[in-house]
């Protein structure tokens, strides 16, 4: 793989002193979890110290906003939360703005800053929970736009190699809710900052009917602000606030199937919801599959399925990782038995050791 090493900056190494930390408030599912060794990364100069510290532990768990993880009751290892701050415009040309955000920035806050400054192109991704640094790992996407569509490059710390590395789209190997980072040893990389190429002139992406209805209520040509407001309104209406009901957003990926499989399923289930993809495959609506299996609003122990969005698993109070995963497994089994399709979880399931 071709990656460019960023020249080392001459700066003092900031020390890291691990401390015990309750992680219940550090994951949006609100799962009870304890880290005997926890550090917060607030400046890039701390990364060499992390490389020196990590080998002393069984595993290194890198956390962002905790919105896409299932944490165990106790983590045997070092937990490092990325809190690196900063947003700046680093360049512009005739066809794009190039904007850089540090990995610890809140994703929705960053999108809002872009819309406020006229750096349009990320508005379809508004209100997705988490941090900027976690966004490329998952290749987040919503309402017809994926992070990969707006990606320029990123800088990541190679924990074992002890160096900063610059990576472009080819090196990141983006796919549907997937990237190079999801196939590496956990804790091998810490993303430091991400740069985005935001198109000029801007064109709205209104592929979803809900978005079309919300963004053009007045009949005028939609603006980026109107699309942003519409996305926020739709998400708030459909998805629970993690501050009120513990959840990790969409828990399952929408499965991809070939045209033949989709046609066979349509013959048996005429109401099947699917979306054509550029490669000829079809993306099935996982929420529809789960709903049709009767799971919407149901509960299994302390874990449940949200009553308005079947893709969202929620903590009904006191749930632990095993409760969430037992519910997920039951849903997967029912969907596979009925439709012959295996649902894949989106969140990273962190092992206890």
UniProtKB/Swiss-Prot annotation:
Molecular function, one GO term: FAD binding
Pathway(s) of this molecule: Cell wall biogenesis; peptidoglycan biosynthesis
Q: Where is the FAD-binding PCMH-type domain?
A: 31-201
Gene3D superfamilies recorded for this chain?
3.30.465.10, UDP-N-acetylenolpyruvoylglucosamine reductase, C-terminal domain, Uridine Diphospho-n-acetylenolpyruvylglucosamine Reductase, domain 2
Report the catalytic activity: UDP-N-acetyl-alpha-D-muramate + NADP(+) = UDP-N-acetyl-3-O-(1-carboxyvinyl)-alpha-D-glucosamine + NADPH + H(+)
Q: Where is the active site?
A: 177, 250 (proton donor), 346
- One Pfam family, please name it: FAD_binding_4
Cellular-component GO terms for this entry: cytosol
Q: Sorted alphabetically, which InterPro entries does this protein's record hold?
A: FAD-bd_PCMH, FAD-bd_PCMH-like_sf, FAD-bd_PCMH_sub1, FAD-bd_PCMH_sub2, MurB, MurB_C, MurB_C_sf, Oxid_FAD_bind_N
The record's Gene Ontology biological-process terms are: cell division; cell wall organization; peptidoglycan biosynthetic process; regulation of cell shape
Q: Which cysteine pairs are joined by S-S bonds?
A: none
Top-level class of the enzyme under EC nomenclature: oxidoreductase
* Enzyme Commission code(s) on record: 1.3.1.98
Record bears the keyword Flavoprotein:
yes
Keywords in alphabetical order, please: Cell cycle, Cell division, Cell shape, Cell wall biogenesis/degradation, Cytoplasm, FAD, Flavoprotein, NADP, Oxidoreductase, Peptidoglycan synthesis
User: Which co-factor is required?
Assistant: FAD
User: Which cellular compartments is it found in?
Assistant: Cytoplasm
Q: Give the family from UniProt.
A: Belongs to the MurB family.
Function per UniProt: Cell wall formation.
Protein name (database record): UDP-N-acetylenolpyruvoylglucosamine reductase
Gene name of the record: murB
């Amino acid at each position: 793989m071709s990656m460019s090493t960023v020249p080392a900056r001459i700066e003092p190494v900031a020390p890291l002193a691990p401390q015990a930390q309750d992680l219940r408030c550090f994951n949006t599912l609100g799962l009870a979890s304890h880290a005997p060794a926890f550090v917060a990364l607030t400046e890039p100069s701390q990364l060499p110290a992390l490389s020196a510290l990590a080998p002393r532990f069984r595993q290194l768990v890198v956390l962002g906003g905790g919105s896409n993880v299932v944490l165990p009751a106790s983590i045997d290892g070092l937990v490092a939360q990325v809190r690196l701050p900063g947003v700046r415009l680093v360049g512009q040309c005739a066809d794009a703005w190039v904007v850089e955000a540090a990995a610890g920035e809140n994703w929705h806050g960053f999108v809002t800053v872009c819309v406020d400054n006229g750096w349009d192109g990320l508005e379809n991704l508004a209100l997705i929970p988490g941090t900027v640094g976690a966004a490329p790992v998952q290749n987040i996407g919503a309402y017809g736009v994926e992070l990969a569509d707006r990606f320029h490059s990123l800088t990541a710390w190679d924990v074992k190699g002890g160096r900063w590395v610059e990576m472009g789209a080819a090196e990141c190997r983006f796919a549907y809710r997937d990237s190079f980072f999801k196939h590496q040893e956990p804790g091998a990389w810490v993303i430091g900052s991400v740069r985005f190429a935001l198109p000029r002139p801007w064109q709205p992406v209104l592929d979803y009917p809900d978005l079309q209805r919300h963004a053009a209520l007045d009949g005028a040509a939609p603006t980026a602000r109107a699309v942003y407001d519409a996305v926020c309104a739709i998400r708030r209406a459909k998805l629970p606030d993690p501050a009120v009901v513990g959840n990790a957003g969409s828990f399952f990926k929408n499965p991809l199937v070939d045209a033949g499989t989709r046609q066979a399923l349509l013959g048996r289930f005429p109401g099947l919801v699917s979306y054509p993809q550029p490669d000829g495959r079809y993306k099935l609506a996982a929420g529809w599959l789960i709903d049709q299996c009767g799971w919407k609003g149901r509960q299994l122990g302390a874990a449940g399925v949200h009553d308005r969005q079947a893709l969202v698993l929620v903590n009904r109070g006191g749930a632990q990782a095993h409760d969430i995963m037992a519910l997920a497994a039951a849903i997967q089994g029912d969907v596979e038995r009925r439709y012959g399709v295996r649902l894949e979880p989106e969140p990273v399931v962190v092992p206890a050791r």
